[in-house]
């Protein structure tokens, strides 16, 4: 079941029992300054106000309480708030320009891996400035989750993780504070689900 909430993730986390989720995969804002976000986007295209709350100790304490394992994108921007780890995930994009060629994620699990796939900007229509490919989330789930695991995403963003969980049969709870992003992600998931239901001719 895919369960999406248009809510502040802190409000939702407060309602969760300890270890309610086997795995949290989170892509939070990395900075409290919109200008510090990834360059190259048309500022009028996205709502940067929704991206100005980077992780803090209170958020991380709650996240670690409700989930048994965690994957946190952009951890190098808030490394001082996290426990030390030998496990780092690298998404290698094979691209040039304003964007970083590699994005890093912290993992509580004892394995480091590289997702080495060419980044194709035209593979989806962007609805969020830090949108990641569905294939990346599918890879994370196949390598870091087990069948039957319940997944948490506190910053749903574009909803790529929701599509990946739907494709692979994982239960997901996703939270998104910004109403516009939430509605866009929900619509994107619904369109994907409806396409899968179209009978073959």
What are these regions (language model features)?
Residues 1-142, 146-152, 160-201:
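Class I S-adenosyl-L-methionine-dependent methyltransferase catalytic core
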């Amino acid at each position: 079941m895919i369960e999406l909430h248009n809510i502040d993730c802190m409000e939702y986390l407060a309602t969760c029992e300890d270890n309610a989720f086997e795995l949290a995969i989170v892509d939070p804002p990395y900075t409290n300054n919109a200008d510090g976000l990834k360059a190259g986007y048309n500022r009028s295209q996205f709502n940067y106000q929704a991206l100005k709350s980077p992780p803090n100790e209170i958020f991380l304490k709650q996240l670690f309480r409700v989930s048994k394992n965690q994957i946190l994108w952009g951890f190098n921007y808030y490394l001082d708030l996290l426990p030390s780890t030998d496990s780092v995930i690298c998404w290698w994009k094979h691209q040039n320009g304003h964007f970083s060629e590699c994005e890093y994620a912290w993992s509580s699990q004892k394995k480091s891996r590289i997702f080495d796939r060419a980044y194709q900007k035209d593979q989806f229509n962007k609805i969020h400035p830090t949108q990641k490919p569905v294939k990346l989330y599918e890879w994370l789930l196949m390598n870091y989750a087990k069948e039957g695991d319940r997944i948490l995403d506190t910053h749903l963003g574009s909803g790529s993780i929701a599509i990946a969980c739907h494709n692979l049969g994982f239960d997901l709870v996703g939270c998104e504070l910004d109403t516009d992003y939430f509605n866009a992600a929900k619509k994107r998931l619904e369109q994907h689900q409806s396409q899968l239901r179209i009978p073959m001719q």
